[in-house]
């Protein structure tokens, strides 16, 4: 039993930073955080677009993809057939057509001086969807995670 406590403590210390990378600001719903991170109907330059995300998290996010479409159109993907997500959950949905998107990747800097490169893409995407929370738009399901780009 004495040996278990140090191992548990080590696990918690190592797991803490991983959890922070996937956490969202608690005053936002997961759908609203998804919208902030991934919905950008009109393309913006990556340095500018990413500063909005980084200001919430107080660090330079290493990579982010912006879908150049409306939240309504992306939420409509949630009505399509469910598929298995990367995490083995069954709440993912693939877009029926490709969309324009921008992939932003951190090239240098420390928060708040984060610098990004941009790559324009035209691809399909997969989103994880959940039932909406009270302050979310009134759809049956709303996107909460960008699972992959195809």
From Swiss-Prot:
Keyword Disulfide bond: yes
Gene responsible for this protein: RNASE6
CDD domains: RNase_A_canonical (cd06265)
Subunit structure: Interacts (via N-terminus) with bacterial lipopolysaccharide (LPS).
EC number: 3.1.27.-
The UniProt record lists the keyword Disulfide bond: yes
Protein name: Ribonuclease K6
Pfam families: RnaseA
Residues of the active site: 38, 145
Role noted for this protein: Ribonuclease which shows a preference for the pyrimidines uridine and cytosine. Has potent antibacterial activity against a range of Gram-positive and Gram-negative bacteria, including P.aeruginosa, A.baumanii, M.luteus, S.aureus, E.faecalis, E.faecium, S.saprophyticus and E.coli. Causes loss of bacterial membrane integrity, and also promotes agglutination of Gram-negative bacteria. Probably contributes to urinary tract sterility. Bactericidal activity is independent of RNase activity.
Positions marked as site (Critical for catalytic activity): 61
Molecular function GO labels: endonuclease activity; nucleic acid binding; RNA nuclease activity
UniProt KW keywords: Antibiotic, Antimicrobial, Disulfide bond, Endonuclease, Glycoprotein, Hydrolase, Lysosome, Nuclease, Secreted, Signal
Sequence positions that bind substrate: 61-65, 86, 105
Secretion signal, residue range per the UniProt entry: 1-23
Species whose genome carries this gene: Chlorocebus aethiops
Site (Facilitates cleavage of polynucleotide substrates): 59
Biological process (GO), any one: defense response to Gram-positive bacterium
GO cellular component: extracellular space; lysosome
Sugar attachment sites: 55, 100
